[in-house]
Amino acid sequence: MLTMGTALSQQVDANWQTYIMIAVYFLILMLLAFTYKQATGNLSEYMLGGRSIGPYITALSAGASDMSGWMIMGLPGSVYSTGLSAMWITIGLTLGAYINYFVVAPRLRVYTELAGDAITLPDFFKNRLNDKNNVLKIISGLIIVVFFTLYTHSGFVSGGKLFESAFGLDYHFGLILVAFIVIFYTFFGGYLAVSITDFFQGVIMLIAMVMVPIVAMMNLNGWGTFHDVAAMKPTNLNLFKGLSFIGIISLFSWGLGYFGQPHIIVRFMSIKSHKMLPKARRLGISWMAVGLLGAVAVGLTGIAFVPAYHIKLEDPETLFIVMSQVLFHPLVGGFLLAAILAAIMSTISSQLLVTSSSLTEDFYKLIRGEEKAKTDQKEFVMIGRLSVLVVAIVAIAIAWNPNDTILNLVGNAWAGFGASFSPLVLFALYWKGLTRAGAVSGMVSGALVVIVWIAWIKPLAHINEIFGLYEIIPGFIVSVIVTYVVSKLTKKPGAFVETDLNKVRDIVREK
């Protein structure tokens, strides 16, 4: 019986082409960074690409930065372990992303420009609610920094696992290598480089997610592979088996998080015009649906693949790595490993840039002042670059000793943003009665409920399954209630809010 490490190490040692393919991929990313470095003369260009991004880059960069290593490693591993029932999460995510394009994207693109040309979510909240004391901006900025540092560390864990599994290299070496490349092109190239590389990486990811399950089926039993998977364990192809109502709701509820994920909705803020969003939506949702179905297919075919090839799979989340190395020529295998790196690094780079934006725009600018920011753009761009480096170092330190699955790490951070920001974004875009006190209270209560649920409530799931509910649900509900109630009880905003909301609505309706 082959162990994953020995089989793959022998194969990679014998085929240097794999290394060449990875090296070429890294070189392309670094060249892109240098190419777009000149387009980062001011803070808006470095952080938001000057709001000049087209629909196709918007679509694939949003998808690539959203899915991360979770789509290629986490989801196939979950399907391999639990069967088709893990697909509920893909249904929830696809529906959430689709609604996001309709409900959030157009208004956010228009409103952020109208509200003082805000380039970060906290900056938008501040301008939307006339937060002269910057309380809302500081708290929302802190939430971004804390949760994104945790989120980014999950990407570094994925990178370390990849090099450890595929090449038999030390986990820490892989972690540092991935970190270096991501930091390099984010540090120098800014938002435009990140968006272009995400587009490029999104294409690679899609090809990989279609290719691997098809070739696996061709090498197994064709469409009969699914019959074999069901024969091994009937529940493997049952969408409901093994899941309670609480389990289904928990997986489905991942879609709630989309409205408040800063690294995703910033893509809507940077598109050239809200009129381009329908094109972006059609491509983005199609890419997502095909990619997620491919990931599910990898997991299902993997159930038959592992015993057929006598492989001892020690970590289900490395299933895609194993299949790509065993089934393909080293050059193609190298391309597929590049797809995993694409998934990992596209998300890390987007998260680093959003966190850097928050540290620079929401904190450093408060210290240096608005006038200084207008007169010395180079200083602020440099602070943005240094912030990328600082956040990455902290995330690497946390990832140095991984102690959880990629899916759990991503899930915790996703819930944190979903409960903190999703209700607030929706209220800010649609409700004239939202107040600063309501926004702060709802945002903080949502974040606290998520933290408390993870730390103290979820461990009680063995007592009653309700305690195992995905933390985004109680966090989202509490945030909505608190935001609404506190807003009703506090001083109403000025008439300018209703005027702005009406203006945003009218602009969005323009064809």
UniProtKB/Swiss-Prot annotation:
Does the record's keyword annotation contain Ion transport? yes
Its membrane topology = Multi-pass membrane protein
Gene transcribed to yield this protein = putP
Give GO MF terms, alphabetically.
L-proline transmembrane transporter activity; proline:sodium symporter activity; sodium ion binding
Q: Where is it predominantly found? A: membrane
Question: What is the protein name for this chain?
Answer: Sodium/proline symporter
Looking at the Swiss-Prot or TrEMBL record, what is one Pfam family this protein matches?
A: SSF
Lineage, highest ranks first:
Bacteria, Bacillati, Bacillota, Bacilli, Bacillales
An annotated GO cellular component = plasma membrane
Function statement:
Catalyzes the sodium-dependent uptake of extracellular L-proline. Since most S.aureus strains are L-proline auxotrophs, this transporter may aid the bacterial persistence during an infection of tissues with low proline concentrations.
